[in-house]
Structure formats: structure tokens, C-alpha cells
Regions:
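A short, active-site helix/loop in glycosyltransferases that binds the activated sugar's phosphate group
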Residues: 112, 123-148, 156-158
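Nucleotide-activated donor-binding/catalytic signature segment of Leloir-type glycosyltransferases, i.e.
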Residues: 218-234
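Conserved donor-binding/catalytic core segment of Leloir-type glycosyltransferases
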Residues: 4, 167-186, 192-195
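Conserved acidic donor-binding segment of nucleotide-sugar-dependent glycosyltransferases
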Residues: 291-300, 308-314
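A charged, aromatic-enriched C-terminal amphipathic alpha-helix characteristic of glycosyltransferases
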Residues: 162-163, 314-369
Length: 387
């Protein structure tokens, strides 16, 4: 089957990118003919089936459409896999695919109205968490009626064995965090507040941070230097060498889909200290017990819950680690691709439900504005449809 993957970025570090790399490595082996198109990447890929459109903040929707139209033929007779469905509102009519399937990896502020603008543009949606399945189902009821919204297990390469750990009693507790050090979504400026709450509760802890970003220098000034280790960006064995030493993993994000880093940590027996933000991470953490989820963003409650966990017998904590590890069993690459292939094949075989011919795009003054400016001043202008 011809597959046309479409997303914004490929070269950055993130969960969507890790999944796209798996598709690049495995789609052909599974009998597909894949192509990859990236909106904001430059067109200098070594891979012959990769194309970058070179979009930037100065581009307008009008200029984006003109450039995208030059690559419309890539979608002919294919199933378009629209990762996070970016740009479909103003590009779908230039995408002559047999079917359009959304693969929703993420949650974000304004996701509900964004999804509502996708009505009639998609033939099915795969979601990485039950929370996203519920949201998509409520926003796109026509897809729900015909069972075209489905959960897909995010693939992770976990550790093959649980690392050995010294008992928590009488030693420093290691709390990890993974991500890009930025305000948008990750809200890393909250980490110092969490650290202060843990100190006030008398918890002997050490923060270990994996990642980098624009707020790193600020964090280095604000977090206690004697309790914080900045590891920078790591990958492969270096990444696992850090993560396997952690006792807990936390987050202070405004929103998440299902964090791959949390699943990877679970595979190493790392336990969550998870804020309740309505993500897939909340759901998995709650399966281990209410004490692993704290009200966002009540840092005092987070410290109190961690203190109650630390007071438990080591055998109870060990059992929780084993249960966390067991939660990742369903997240194999084999299961991910089995679900993906079966769903896409079914959608391709069943009648089309997305609009095959969309209305000609009318004149919108906003289509002439710089996209980067519009995302800040008038985000709704970025999702106007051809109607």
C-alpha cells in the first residue's frame, strides 16, 4: 500500500519524530511504499522518499498552498497519514489521497476546537491514549458511528530487565524529568516551585533533567545546584544509563498525549509523580494507585503524596515498580504496527467518508498574513477551512 506521511518536523527530538523514524525503518519491510513530506524542514534529506517544504513563520497560508500544490501528486493513489493533522484545514483539497487518516500523538490547549475543524476531512483517526479517543469521538461523531476512531499503543523500546535498586529508606531519592526546557507546553518554570515543596516536606531528593532548551540557563539559576543534575540531550545507551538510575519521574506540563519518556521509565521500574492534566500519563499512573497522581499544580500535595509513598514498605514499592513495568507490555513495536496496518487497511477497503472534492478556497485576507504572526495574534486564522 502507498502511504504518504505528512507532519511538520522530522529532525527535532520528540515523540512524533521517534514514531516517524520507526515508520521510515519498517514500512517497506511490511510491504508498504512510504513517502514522507515535512512542512517546516528544508529539502536537503539524503533519503529519496523524504521531502521538506521549507515552510517558515514568514510564509503565509497562500504561499504554503502554492508550494504544497507542487507536491500534490505524491498523494495520488495513497493513504495519507496526517500526523497530528496539522494544516489539513487549508491543505486537504491539495491532497488527492484515496483516504486521509489522522494519527493523533498529542494533546494541546485548543485541541477540541481544532478537532472540530477536521469534520469531513478524515476517514479515520488513530489516537495514542484513551483520553484522546474520547475527545476525538466527541468532536467527530460521524467517525465514531462507523468505528473509525481507535486506540493505538505507542511503541517503546524498554529495558529487558528491571534494574537493581538500593532500598529507598535512608538515601537520596532520584526524581527525573525528560523534555525540552521551554515554557510552551512543558512549563519548566514550575520545576523550582516543585523543588521548594519537596524541600519543605523534608524529602532528601535529587532532580535529574534530560534535555535542553531555551530555559536551561534560567533553570540552572533557579533550581538548587546541590540537588540538580543537568544531563543535556542523550540518546541510545547514554539515555538509558541515566534513566535506569531514577526512582521517580515527574512532569509539570500543561498538556501531554501519552509521554513516551514515561513509558520508557516504566519499563525500568521508575514510578510516576504525575500531575492530573487529563493525559494518558494520568491514566497509567492512576492504575498504579491514587498516590501517584497529584492535583495540578499543587506542589504541596505532590510532596505529601511522595512522602506517603516513601513511607511504604520496600516490598510494596517493589510491587508497584513491577506493575509499572507490566503496563508497558502492550507497547511493543509489533503491536503498534499490527494495529496501524489493520486499521489503515480497513479504512482503505471501506467506503470513503471524507469529502473527496472540497470547495475551492475563497479569498481570505488572513491567508496573506505571515503564519508565525497569525499563530500569536489570531490562531483561529490558522485553521480556516475552504468554506
Amino acid at each position: 500500500m502507498r502511504l504518504s506521511h505528512f507532519f511538520t518536523y522530522y529532525r527535532t527530538l520528540g515523540g512524533v519524530q521517534s514514531v516517524l523514524k520507526r515508520h521510515h525503518a519498517a514500512d517497506v519491510k511490511r510491504g508498504h511504499e512510504p513517502a514522507f513530506l515535512f512542512a517546516f524542514e528544508s529539502d536537503d534529506f539524503a533519503e529519496p522518499n523524504f521531502t521538506g517544504l521549507g515552510f517558515g513563520g514568514a510564509h503565509s497560508i497562500s504561499s504554503m498552498r502554492a508550494r504544497f500544490a507542487n507536491h500534490s501528486s505524491r498523494f495520488t493513489d495513497s493513504v495519507a497519514i496526517c500526523h497530528n493533522m496539522w494544516g489539513l484545514q487549508f491543505l486537504a483539497d491539495l491532497m488527492p489521497a484515496k483516504r486521509r487518516v489522522g494519527l493523533l500523538h498529542s494533546d494541546w490547549t485548543g485541541l477540541r476546537p481544532f478537532l472540530e475543524t477536521q469534520r469531513g476531512l478524515l476517514d479515520g483517526v488513530l489516537c495514542v491514549s484513551n483520553a484522546l479517543v474520547e475527545l476525538v469521538s466527541s468532536c467527530l461523531p460521524d467517525l465514531t458511528k462507523s468505528n473509525r476512531v481507535k486506540l493505538i499503543p505507542y511503541p517503546v523500546d524498554g529495558l529487558t530487565a528491571m534494574p537493581e535498586r538500593a532500598p529507598l529508606a535512608g538515601r537520596t531519592v532520584v526524581i527525573g524529568w525528560v523534555g525540552r526546557m521551554q515554557t510552551e507546553q512543558k512549563r519548566v518554570e514550575r520545576l523550582p516551585g516543585l523543588a521548594k515543596a519537596l524541600e519543605s516536606a523534608g524529602i532528601d531528593f535529587r532532580f535529574e533533567l534530560l534535555g535542553d532548551g531555551p530555559r536551561q540557563a534560567w533553570l540552572e539559576q533557579q533550581l538548587p545546584s546541590d540537588r540538580t543534575v543537568f544531563h543535556g540531550r542523550k540518546s541510545a545507551d547514554e539515555y538509558w544509563a541515566v534513566l535506569r538510575r531514577w526512582d521517580f519521574i515527574t512532569s509539570v506540563s500543561d498538556y501531554e498525549g501519552l509521554p513516551i519518556s514515561m513509558l520508557e521509565a516504566f519499563s525500568a521500574g521508575v514510578l510516576p509523580i504525575c500531575p492530573a492534566i487529563g493525559s494518558g500519563g494520568d491514566e497509567y499512573s492512576a492504575e498504579l494507585g491514587d498516590e501517584f497522581v497529584w492535583e495540578a499544580f499543587d506542589f504541596g500535595q505532590a510532596a505529601s503524596k511522595l512522602k506517603s509513598i516513601l513511607a511504604k514498605p520496600e516490598s510494596t514499592i517493589g510491587q508497584a515498580r513491577a506493575e509499572a513495568r507490566a503496563l508497558t507490555n502492550r507497547h511493543s513495536e509489533v503491536e503498534y504496527f499490527r494495529t496501524f496496518d489493520q486499521f489503515v487497511a480497513r479504512i482503505a477497503d471501506e467506503p470513503r467518508v471524507s469529502a473527496e472534492r472540497l470547495a475551492k478556497r475563497p479569498f481570505y485576507f488572513s491567508d496573506r498574513l505571515p503564519f508565525g504572526l497569525m499563530t500569536r495574534l489570531w490562531p483561529n486564522g490558522c485553521t480556516r477551512r475552504n468554506e
